């Protein structure tokens, strides 16, 4: 499956995954599509806060925001999926607080965001169960643990 990935690093965070890792995670999540084009922008908290405030009216930086491409109906067959914005410091903080391996948490959030770009959501319980099941299956293929196994509290802040 050809994937055109534009990785933009606008963060000073350490321990960021490599472009090859981002590509592998996206290809796994998007394997049902023949072709895909997307941008992943890695940001610090200031930009994450600004975007979350502007688009979700939430006064905090969230881990991942998805922006599906708004493609006119006559061009629906083009491979453009949209953009993911991932706040690197939030990802690192959540991994620490939730006692999750950092790379596993990155993989989860990239897969989660890609699934949103494919139209999956978690607004109601049935949708959430479908999306979380798929996330678990994909992460298991990578050898990562179930990201929801230790959810004693609210799930990590997720985009809508």
From Swiss-Prot:
Q: Which cofactor does it need?
A: Zn(2+)
First-listed, main subcellular location of the protein, grouped into a coarse class: cytoplasm
Q: What class of enzyme is it?
A: hydrolase
The entry's keywords:
Cytoplasm, Endonuclease, Hydrolase, Metal-binding, Nuclease, Ribosome biogenesis, rRNA processing, Zinc
Q: Where found in the cell?
A: Cytoplasm
Residue ranges of the region described as Disordered: 141-160
Q: Which NCBIfam families match?
A: rRNA maturation RNase YbeY
Family under the similarity heading: Belongs to the endoribonuclease YbeY family.
| Protein name, entry field | Endoribonuclease YbeY
What organism does the UniProt record list as the source? Pseudomonas paraeruginosa (strain DSM 24068 / PA7) (Pseudomonas aeruginosa (strain PA7))
Q: What is the lineage of its organism?
A: Bacteria, Pseudomonadati, Pseudomonadota, Gammaproteobacteria, Pseudomonadales
Supply the gene name: ybeY
């Amino acid at each position: 499956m050809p994937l055109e990935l534009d990785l933009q690093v606008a963060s000073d965070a350490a321990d960021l995954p490599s472009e090859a890792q981002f590509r592998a995670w996206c290809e796994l999540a998007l394997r049902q599509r023949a072709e895909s084009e997307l941008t992943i922008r890695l940001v610090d908290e200031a930009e994450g806060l600004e975007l979350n405030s502007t688009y979700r009216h939430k006064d905090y930086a969230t881990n991942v925001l998805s922006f599906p491409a708004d493609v006119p109906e006559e061009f629906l067959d083009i491979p453009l999926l949209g953009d993911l914005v991932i706040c690197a410091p939030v990802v690192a903080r959540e991994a620490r607080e939730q006692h999750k391996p950092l790379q596993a948490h990155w993989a989860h959030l990239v897969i989660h965001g890609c699934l949103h770009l494919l139209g999956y959501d978690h607004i109601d319980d049935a949708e959430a169960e479908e999306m979380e099941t798929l996330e678990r299956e994909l992460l298991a293929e990578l050898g990562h643990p179930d990201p929801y196994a230790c959810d004693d509290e609210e799930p990590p802040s997720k985009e809508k």
